[in-house]
């Protein structure tokens, strides 16, 4: 097995394509976006992921090819890595991309090709959506597997080699073929008994993460009502206590955690079960950016008497700061912006990886991390990008307009420095 197609050149597919090329496979990447294909053809990654652009430079045109279609003579294996969004209105899974990808694979390949679904899907989608497209062209002889992507953005290439790879198959032969392929990429394979078991692994992993973080946020919101410092409570609760740690409060977004709970809930309801915890956790995490935005506006009004025309600098527009990413899917700022606009705030914005044009397109004036503080009535640090903690905070605070507010979401800045400068300091559930 030497040639592999990767359908979908987003965060999942592009990193997988580079990882495969690094291991000696000849890779044919496919994407429907002309802009994505143009960038990749020039050796430019259209997204930020450490090591990807270097991989493009090393393998493009030799072991890594990109185009709108798979080669006409097929490939040994295909990985389907297309996006599976949920409806912004109903949150129902939208599987048109998955179906179209399967149809393309069926048209360009044959029954000897191993098809591996890597997109996050509802339980049963590989069998009920992908398989019919393949059997419709090939007949009953199909090799189909599901192998979930479980890496974290910012460390994806490393984790592709280090994390155990779960693999389920339509049958044992399909599963074993996929396991053999992935054994050339990663150190450990975890076989499971079906496509559906592998699909559920991905969903429960992500929903568990969402749930863990939501409890830290709940603790913060409760502590705020008692006038307590949630970080003091959480650190004391965790210290040398041999039980699962409480999570630090913070935003929970991204392309996976913002949609996968809805995919799991939809799949569970389809078989007659309504989850108790999954939806509550997601709802709390979605509420948090709204709560913070309203709190920022209230603090500005408290300081100035009115928020109209006040300058707010927002640092960190991606959905997270560590590991760094430029991904804005599920970013807190999307929920916050309508609140800020309604309050009449004058917005400045900075992110170390999100392009200035993107920030400008969302209605803020792009500035440097240092200039963001100049004349600001308030500064909101959304992400925990480590470079923000390295700023000369006393110097930055000195150029803010007075009275001033600093909302440090992740509590990565020096609270004492802010208080010494006469700046109101607050964080999630604090201040």
Language-model features: locations:
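Structural/interface elements that position substrates and couple domains in central-metabolism enzymes
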Residues: 1-431
